Amino acid sequence: MKNLLKMSDLSPAELIHILDVAGQLKAQQKLGGTAPLLAGKSVALLFSKASTRTRTSFEVGVYQMGGLGNYMNTSELQAGRGEPLKDTARVLGRYYDCVVWRTYRQRDLEEFAELAGVPVINGLTDYAHPCQVLADLMTIREHRGTLAGQKLCFVGDGSSMANSLIAGGLLAGMQVTCVCPESYRPAADVLMFARKYGSQFHLTADPAEGVRDADVVATAVWNTAAPGTPESEQRLRDFVGYQLTGKLLEAAKPDAMVLHCLPAHRGEEISTAVFEQHAPEIFDEAENRLHVQKAVLAILLAGK
């Protein structure tokens, strides 16, 4: 693994190795601290979007492993005044051992990775959110003991979370169902990737069908438009019936897990009651962002 740009870049063995290392680092941290695996290393934390979990978990993770993490908002750099992306990549690659970038376009991230000359980690793009999905898979494995054969259902729009959960779940040997309205499907290349797995993947617009007998049901914000705008109102209409409610989850297994990448819009993609019922899993999931990201850094920079 040279970078972490999207889930489908990983092999099944690489994915499981990340989770194994994450588990080891989590156990070490609970016992008093992680070895200084990043001593003498510097990590650029480059953000073009607002962030709570991604920024803070990377900052804390780099610190816990003895490295230096520098947060930068791209609006405050020369890149925010028109300096070409390729120049920023080649400069930061000379200063830092690794770059984490949270941005909009996946193709910008991939161009950056080609030019930087150091490992690049996707902190979220409009296409992919691999760090979050690694945390999801770690959480499922902690609660269930295994990933292979588990039925994972994602309910929402064809967002970075859908794209990444589909790829990650299939690579981990899970049965994956994606539930979304017809006009909000995942990316075409993700669906092509998923179809290689045959009956292991299912796409439907019917929430009740999708969650039937699921071991894990995941969702994410699907109303990302500003409140009161025409787009927001349209999404509220289009996603009627797609909220995770107690009634909908009756079709899942009685002990089904519920995951949410946060932040949550209670009353839209998930009811308040369901969110609070499954808060222990959801906040385990949030904590595990720290541990999987430490694992990715340790693998890329310390040869773990």
Question: What label would you give each PLM region?
Answer:
Residues D255-A256, C261-K304:
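Adenosine-phosphate binding glycine-rich loop
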Residues S48-V60, E142-A220:
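Glycine-rich phosphate/diphosphate-binding loop of Rossmann-like nucleotide-binding domains
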Residues R195-A273:
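Rossmann-like adenosine-cofactor binding region
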Residues R90, D97-G168, H260:
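Anion-binding alpha/beta catalytic cores of soluble intermediary-metabolism enzymes, centered on
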Residues M65, Y95, L115-G117, A172, ...:
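Short, structured coil segments at secondary-structure junctions
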Residues S42-V43, F47-Y95:
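Active-site cofactor/substrate anionic-group-binding motifs, chiefly glycine-
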Residues M1-T56, V60:
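Positively charged, low-complexity intrinsically disordered leader regions
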